[in-house]
C-alpha cells in the first residue's frame, strides 16, 4: 500500500459572495471591523470586476489539478490535497486538523505565492506547523519559494513573448515591461527580507528569456496603513517611465500573483489602464497562470523536489 502524503495548498482566500466581504475584511484587520467607508470602497471594487473575485474557483481548481498531476507523474506515494486559506474558511488550521484526522503523518506545504517573505510564506507555514505541533504526529515540510522554478519562469516568458509578438517593430521599440508583485511594508527590507530581491531576480529572468530590453520593477496593491510601503507604485512608475523615456506601450506582468483576482482585475486592468489612457499609451496584460497545464506542471516539479529532499 502506498504511503499517503498530505499536500497542503495555502492561499490568501477571498470572499465567496458579497455578504462575506465584511467578515473577510475584519479578519484581515485582525478582528477590527472596517469603517462603513472602507467597506463600501472594497465592495465597490468587487462590483467593478463583476461582483466577486474568480479567485476562490481558480484556487480550488489549481489545488485539485496539482493533486491529480502529482499522482500521475509518480507512483511511490499517494498525495492527498487539503486547502488552507489565510483569511476565510477553510482556514489553514482547519486543513491541518483534517489532515491529522485522516492519519496523515507527513505533508508538503505549498503557498500559492512564488516569492518568500516573512509576511506571507513564513506566516502561512508557521500557522500550519504550529497547529501540527499542537496535534502531534504530523510533520509539515514547508516550501519557502519557487520563483526560480524553470517552468514558472517559462510560463511568463511565453506569456510576455505572446504580447510582444503581436506588436509592430515600431511599437516594440516604444514598449516597456513592468514586472510587479504585492507591495509590503518597507520595514521588511531593514529586517533583511529577501522578497524585493527575489522579485528583481524574477524580472531579470523573464526579460532575458523574452528578449525584452526595456523593463522595470514596480509594486502594487499597497495596504492602507500609516507605514510606508515598498515602491515605486505601478501607477506612479507608469507615469514616470512615460515622461522620462516616452514609452507608449505598457506590458504589465503581475508575477507575484498566480491567478486573476481583485489585485489584477482592478489594480492592473482598471487602475493602471486609467493611467495609460490618461497618457495616451497602450495597455497590455498577459493572461495569469491560473490553472493552466504549464503552471500546474511547474508546481508539480516544486512539490516533487521538496518531497525528495525531505523524505
Swiss-Prot record:
The record, for CDD domains, names:
Ferrochelatase_C, Ferrochelatase_N
Cited InterPro entries: Ferrochelatase, Ferrochelatase_AS, Ferrochelatase_C, Ferrochelatase_N
Q: Which GO terms describe its biological process?
A: heme biosynthetic process
Which reaction is catalysed here?
Answer: Fe-coproporphyrin III + 2 H(+) = coproporphyrin III + Fe(2+)
- What SUPFAM superfamilies does UniProt report for this protein, alphabetically? Chelatase (SSF53800)
Annotated PROSITE patterns: FERROCHELATASE
Keyword annotations for this protein, in alphabetical order, are: Cytoplasm, Heme biosynthesis, Iron, Lyase, Metal-binding, Porphyrin biosynthesis
Answer whether the UniProt record assigns the keyword Cytoplasm to this protein.
yes
Which NCBIfam families does the UniProt record give?
A: hemH, PRK12435.1
Please identify the protein, giving its name as recorded: Coproporphyrin III ferrochelatase 1
Q: Which gene encodes it?
A: cpfC1
Amino acid at each position: 500500500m502506498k504511503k499517503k502524503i498530505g499536500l497542503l495548498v495555502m492561499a490568501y482566500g477571498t470572499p465567496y459572495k458579497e455578504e462575506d466581504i465584511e467578515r473577510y475584511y475584519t479578519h484581515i484587520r485582525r478582528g477590527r471591523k472596517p469603517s462603513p467607508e472602507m467597506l463600501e470602497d472594497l465592495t465597490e471594487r468587487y462590483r467593478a470586476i463583476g461582483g466577486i473575485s474568480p479567485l476562490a474557483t481558480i484556487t480550488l481548481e489549481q489545488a485539485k489539478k496539482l493533486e491529480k498531476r502529482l499522482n500521475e507523474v509518480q507512483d511511490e506515494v499517494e498525495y492527498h490535497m487539503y486547502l488552507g486559506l489565510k483569511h476565510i474558511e477553510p482556514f489553514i488550521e482547519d486543513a491541518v486538523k483534517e489532515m491529522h484526522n485522516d492519519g496523515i503523518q507527513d505533508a508538503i506545504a505549498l503557498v500559492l505565492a512564488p516569492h518568500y517573505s516573512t509576511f506571507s510564506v513564513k506566516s502561512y507555514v508557521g500557522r500550519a506547523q504550529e497547529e501540527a505541533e499542537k496535534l502531534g504526529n504530523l510533520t509539515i515540510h514547508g516550501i519557502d519559494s519557487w520563483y526560480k522554478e524553470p517552468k514558472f519562469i517559462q510560463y511568463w516568458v511565453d506569456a510576455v513573448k505572446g504580447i510582444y509578438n503581436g506588436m509592430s517593430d515600431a511599437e516594440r521599440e516604444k514598449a516597456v515591461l513592468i514586472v510587479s508583485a504585492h507591495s509590503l511594508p518597507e520595514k521588511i527590507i531593514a529586517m533583511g527580507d529577501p522578497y524585493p530581491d527575489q522579485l528583481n531576480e524574477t524580472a531579470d529572468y523573464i526579460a532575458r528569456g523574452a528578449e525584452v530590453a526595456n523593463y522595470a520593477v514596480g509594486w502594487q496593491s499597497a495596504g492602507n496603513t500609516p507605514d510606508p510601503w515598498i515602491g515605486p507604485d505601478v501607477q506612479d512608475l507608469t507615469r514616470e517611465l512615460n515622461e522620462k523615456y516616452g514609452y507608449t506601450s505598457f506590458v504589465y506582468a503581475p508575477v507575484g500573483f498566480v491567478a486573476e483576482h481583485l489585485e489584477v482585475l482592478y489594480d492592473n486592468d482598471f487602475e493602471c489602464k486609467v493611467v495609460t489612457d490618461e497618457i495616451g499609451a497602450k495597455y497590455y496584460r498577459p493572461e495569469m497562470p491560473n490553472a493552466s497545464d504549464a503552471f500546474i506542471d511547474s508546481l508539480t516539479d516544486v512539490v516533487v523536489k521538496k518531497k525528495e529532499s525531505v523524505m
